[in-house]
UniProtKB/Swiss-Prot annotation:
Gene Ontology MF terms: 2-oxoglutarate-dependent dioxygenase activity; iron ion binding; L-ascorbic acid binding
Enzyme class: oxidoreductase
Known cofactor(s): Fe(2+); L-ascorbate
InterPro entries the record matches: Oxoglu/Fe-dep_dioxygenase_dom, PKHD_C, PKHD_hydroxylase, Pro_4_hyd_alph, Pro_4_hyd_alph_FE2OG_OXY
Protein name in UniProt: PKHD-type hydroxylase TERTU_2553
Amino acid sequence: MLIVIDALLAEAEVLKWRARLEDAEWLDGRGTGGTLSAAVKSNLQLPDTSELAINLGNTIVQKLGVHPLFLSAALPEKIYPPKFNCYRNGGAYGTHVDSAIMVMPNKQSLRTDISATLFLSDPDSYDGGELEIETAFGAQAVKLNAGDLVLYPSSSLHRVTPVTRGQRVASFIWIQSMVPDEAERALLFDLDQSIQSLISEKPADDPTLLRLTSVYHNLLRRYAKF
């Protein structure tokens, strides 16, 4: 399930943060990949401990924490502090899969159920740089407007194509969901979106709406794992 969240960051916010990112000190991203992924990785990465990474990361997490579409699709239990990368001068990231378990800065373990990319560069400012995600229906190429975010299963093989002009700056994020099974999560998402559409049409005490809401929460109770 690929979900696009439009304008998680407003245009003015993107411009402010991007100006700061352009002046940031970027490091070789290969030092942060696993053995296999490092061999196909050619990008730059912002140090996790930099003030800029922490401040912008906190802003992103705060935005996600109150976004209805994100909450509905991800059902988040834990969010790894956002990281930031930059691709330029032919930089790319070959086909790889994200590690199943990450250790967060607070030493807690996080199971990567959902991955997210938040685009911070305007798509017409660079060539290449598509996020290609392997799905059951073939590879899906994603290149969004600055401020837009895409969610996709962490189990997916994916890659970033070479950036041949300009630079592509983005944030990447991992989420542990309360519902680890992708199919169960997709079912809950579809049901929740249907309920949300009915809320605008029916009174709060409508029997059909109440039954559907009850079904949703009983399924969530069955599927959720802590």
